[in-house]
Amino acid sequence: MLGITNISQSQAQPPNHVYELRMYHTVPGRLTALVNRFRDYTVPIFAKHDMHAIGYWVPQDTPELFVYVLEHPSRDAATKNWAAFMADPEWVKAKADSEASGKIVDHVDNYFMNPADFSKLK
């Protein structure tokens, strides 16, 4: 019974951070354009808006996919940071310029995640 109580209390506590998993499915042949846009523009603009990346990945077995994880203090902070990012004139220009030769992203899957109690990331 004590173990169940501890689990319930652990789950009831708010997490210190929320993590956002984002998976970008690119238009065929446009993965390199997306990676370049992230390297050259998106990452520095994220920093301006307190969007902290944990890492970026290109899966070995899934072509046309780009994956990254952001850390946010809360879901509310994530919403505010994304709104500021999307309205940033530097981002608007970078997106338009990078898509001058065609759309890059087909669709995005994203998930907000809380760390498990045994996770090294809290």
Question: What are these regions, as identified by a protein language model?
Answer:
Residues 33, 119-121:
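Short, solvent-exposed loop/turn elements at domain surfaces
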Residues 26-36:
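Short, surface-exposed ligand-recognition loops at beta-strand->loop->(often short) alpha-helix junctions
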Residues 11-15, 36-54, 62, 71-116:
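An amphipathic, aromatic/His-enriched active-site/gating alpha helix that lines ligand/cofactor pockets
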Residues 1-14:
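Bacterial Sec-dependent signal peptides at the C-terminal "C-region" and cleavage site
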Residues 25-26, 72:
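Short beta-strand segments enriched in hydrophobic/aromatic residues
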Residues 19-23, 67:
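Active-site-flanking beta-strand signature of metal-NTP-handling nucleotidyl enzymes
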